[in-house]
Amino acid sequence: MTTFLAKNWSSLIKPTKVQYEAVDNNPNIKTMVVEPLERGLGLTLGNSLRRVLLSSLRGAAITSIKIPGVEHELSPVSGVKEDLTDIILNIRDVIVKMDSVQKCNLRLEVTGPAVVTAGMITVTDKQDVTILNPQHVICNLSKGFNLEMDLICEQGKGYVPTSCLHNSDSPIGAIHLDALFNPVRRVSYKVENSMVGQMTNYDKLIITVETNGVVNPDAALGLAARILLDQLQVFINFQEVEEEKPEKLELQTINPVLLKKVYELELSVRSQNCLKNENIVYVGDLVARTETQMLKTANFGRKSLNELKKVLANFNLEFGMKDIGWPPDNLESLAKKHEDQY
């Protein structure tokens, strides 16, 4: 692969920042702003991320329930005010978080009168499972009645109808539920203009993500981006060659402030002349000297010393510094490189 081909992507402007902003102080709803993007990429990325967010993220959902004496969705449940259809809809809205297991058994046992909530569900397998909306109402149970229910919770992705969930492992008499595994509830995006320098023909992608709390919105967006990256790898049918980066002449190992010329420090004329007479050219030359050595300099007194100490302190430097690698072997080339950069 040639450098010419690499310019197809390396020459494009890349986003420099992602801003995260909670909506209405709700941690489960965030707006994320990405800019700048090349013209047209805002729409391309926004649409792709939205589709992946709504279809491909994994989560957990209750996939079946079993109530003694109840054989199908139209059967009445003794002592419960709601129809079984309403109970099923309410159970589908129970938010379950389970990371370490693929499938677990849950149990609900309540004696009336009671408002049956999701927080009353217990985990029979003693697995690491959490109900995130414990106050969510499932049904209302009348006095003198008991409600027993076995539930199965599974991991999956996207939306799976009951016809695809039914299998031979299902207990006899189990009622299957349509499962919405995806932890992302809503995604919307818009594209606005972004300014780079004086140019406004770049895109700004503003994407808003709402989740059910199993995963936070910014993590969900990161997962969607990772899924896209993984899926697109198959189309890259060439070997990339890393560009050789010019050597930085040890600038990374030496404090660049040491390469400053002392005349850049805006010292008094007296101090400047003293340093010049002592052939002190760089800040590195200066901090390598001790205070005692400096006071032995002709016409250099305590006042000049205090002036220099104050200036050096602004750079977190001081007299008599050791182990600073000064002077470096290639001082002239490093100084030239420093001047070119600054």
Curated annotation (Swiss-Prot):
A GO cellular-component term linked to this record: cytoplasm
Cited InterPro entries: DNA-dir_RNA_pol_insert, DNA-dir_RNA_pol_RpoA/D/Rpb3, DNA-dir_RpoA, RBP11-like, RNAP_asu_C, RNApol_insert_sf
Top class in the EC scheme: transferase
Keyword field: DNA-directed RNA polymerase, Nucleotidyltransferase, Transcription, Transferase
Superkingdom: Bacteria
Coiled-coil residue spans: none
Annotated stretches, region: Alpha C-terminal domain (alpha-CTD): 254-342
Function: DNA-dependent RNA polymerase catalyzes the transcription of DNA into RNA using the four ribonucleoside triphosphates as substrates.
HAMAP family noted in UniProt: RNApol_bact_RpoA
Subunit description: Homodimer. The RNAP catalytic core consists of 2 alpha, 1 beta, 1 beta' and 1 omega subunit. When a sigma factor is associated with the core the holoenzyme is formed, which can initiate transcription.
Protein name: DNA-directed RNA polymerase subunit alpha
Source organism per UniProt: Orientia tsutsugamushi (strain Boryong) (Rickettsia tsutsugamushi)
Organism lineage string: Bacteria, Pseudomonadati, Pseudomonadota, Alphaproteobacteria, Rickettsiales
